[in-house]
Amino acid sequence: MYRLYDVGYTIALDRAATLLGDLGHGRVLPRRGDARAIEIRNPPLFAALGSRELHIGGAVYTALLSAHLFDFGVCSLRLQITALDGLTWPEFSAFGVAMSGMDVSAAQFDTELSALLKQIGPAIERQTVAPLTEDYVVYRIDRLISADASRTVSEQFPNETLAPLLFGDQRPLAASTLRELMPHRFSYYDDDLSVLTWENALVVEPREHDLDVEFVLEFANAQLLELRLYDLQLGAELPALYDRVDSLRARRPLRLSRAFREVLAGLQTHVADVTETVERVENALKVTNDVYLARVYAAALELFREQAWRHGIDRKLTILRETYSMLNGEALAARAELLELSIVVLIMAELVLSLSKFL
């Protein structure tokens, strides 16, 4: 279970590693062979935060808490809960549904985040926790007890079998609905499977230490959080800007040039910050070839509608740039009018002084 936060403008990961001390466990990169198709400019920092006790369905589970810190200002908290051995598929589905619906409150995650930020605060530029978070659940299976060797794992887990786990639906879903809800299924070997949905994913991977699929899904969620956050901020910025401009026009009609100066400076800085951050987020992970992990990552971005969020941000940035040009033109016009008025006043004063000599 993942919960991702935006905690600041940037995080100096080397500095954060020093501040974490023994809790820090270095940078994280995909390990499998096809990971060569993915380039990560500044790999996230991993921190092991210890174990926590959770109560699920009347049973007590020990969960491992960890964090990934991304240089573009995101902190991802991960709560890893191990199911009991020997569960049947219906039992595992019930466990997964109970886990995803358990009462791990926002306040509990916030408490864990606050403790972490106390340690790494000096490494964060412009530290502030944004009100927006991103949640995602990954169901992981390392071993199938009664696997059918004559069929691939993908064949053993058709969509209708996965629906109760991934969507919580106990009634059979129509075949057309299943195709629409689960279009993203991937297998690299016969014994692995990754199925992605908007809120969660199933990963069947017999190599216990191979967490590469989870890594790229987490990375995609971190990027989604940043895009959603800046889209939200820009959406709030536009009406606030219009209200401020209207107020300045009403209160200072003769001094618009000076009144708009602060607005223009702030607007220019904000547009530059958003543009730089969005580009840094999108360039944090680059796909160089069409292989397994790259396809999983691309599917996650498509599923999370990354392009739609980016288009929304670009549209709002265009409006802000056009507003900047309009206000700048209006300020220049106001300055020119004031200059013309000053010239007229000087001419009138000169005429008055000249006439006064003959009176």
Task: Locate each region found by the language model.
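Short Lys/Arg-enriched alpha/beta "domain-start" segment
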Residues: M1-D192, T197
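Exposed alpha-helical structural elements
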Residues: R15-T18, Q108, E112, T161, ...
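N-proximal short alpha-helices
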Residues: G50, G57, V203, R207, ...
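Short, surface-exposed linear patches
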Residues: A98-M102, L217, L224-L227, I343
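Extended, charged amphipathic alpha-helical segments
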Residues: A163-A259
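Membrane-associated alpha-helical segments
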Residues: L229-D231, E237-L351, K357
